[in-house]
């Protein structure tokens, strides 16, 4: 059942963020709160009651016959079957899109099982498909981590690019007083920054023009990806920003060995600073194929 709350505006490139399962819905909620422009949001869940709390303008309850409006009970096979039951609705919701971000928390039932199905639908339609997902904390049940790893493998087969955020990395950047919800917001920021970065590149005029074709060249059929965001102030603002972006403490990947890079520079910097930033990126990944 697809519920549409509002109309969407036409975009140069139609970009959709699909939040699957509880964690995916929460990530979408935070992006809606941040008022990200140039993106459509869809919440997908088996749990009808949880889905009603999702702020996405479009909501898709999957597997109504299978789950009777309840959750997947932490069983990925139920999430997968629920998505397959609602395959026509998923296809309809993604029709006409140019790029789809699929986000979820790996390890549970709906996200782990349904996200690969949603991604497969998008990719088979020729849509540029990106997965942005979290891995469970090590202190969580072993079964949950095993489910997550299996789900990641299935998702990797059905996306062009995959960004993985291990929740354990959150422990390295927060202090002892940080609550779990506040820590998880940090993981959602990676999704938000990834989406915002791409939409800004495509839809915002800049000195060096990039369009959706350029984004596709870098992200199509590329596998595991590394995303980094950095900011800086003062005399060394440009280099401080690029060093922070390359470090990207929430990811277990590094920029070393990357075959292609999208570099977006925003701010009042000189040509020399821009050159230094680009050179630092090139040295970091040591290939220079596409920048």
Please give the residue ranges for each predicted region.
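Tubulin/FtsZ superfamily GTPase core signature
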Residues: 1-289
């Amino acid at each position: 059942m697809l519920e549409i709350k509002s109309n969407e505006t036409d975009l140069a490139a139609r970009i959709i963020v699909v939040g699957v399962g509880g964690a995916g819905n929460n990530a979408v909620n935070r992006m809606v709160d941040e008022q990200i422009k140039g993106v459509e949001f869809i919440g997908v869940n088996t749990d009808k009651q949880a889905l009603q709390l999702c702020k996405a303008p479009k909501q898709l309850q999957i597997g109504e016959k299978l789950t009777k409006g309840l959750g997947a009970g932490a069983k990925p096979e139920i999430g997968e079957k629920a998505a397959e039951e609602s395959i026509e609705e998923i296809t309809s919701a993604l029709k006409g899109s140019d790029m789809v971000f699929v986000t979820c928390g790996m390890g549970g039932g709906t996200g782990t099982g349904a996200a690969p199905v949603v991604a497969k639908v998008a990719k088979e339609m020729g849509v540029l498909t990106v997965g942005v997902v979290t891995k469970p904390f090590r202190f969580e049940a072993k079964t949950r981590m095993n489910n997550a790893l299996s789900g990641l493998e299935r998702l990797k087969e059905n996306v062009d690019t995959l960004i993985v955020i291990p929740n354990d990395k959150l422990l390295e950047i927060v202090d002892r007083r940080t609550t779990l919800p506040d820590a998880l917001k940090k993981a959602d920021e990676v999704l938000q920054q990834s989406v915002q970065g791409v939409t800004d590149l495509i839809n915002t005029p800049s000195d060096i023009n990039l369009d959706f074709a350029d984004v596709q060249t870098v992200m199509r059929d590329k596998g595991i990806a590394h995303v980094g965001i950095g900011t800086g102030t003062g005399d060394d603002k440009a280099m401080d920003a690029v060093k922070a972006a390359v470090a990207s403490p929430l990811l277990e990947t590094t920029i070393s060995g990357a075959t292609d890079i999208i570099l977006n520079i925003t701010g009042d910097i000189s040509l020399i600073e821009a050159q230094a930033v680009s050179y630092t990126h090139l040295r970091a990944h040591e290939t220079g194929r596409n920048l």
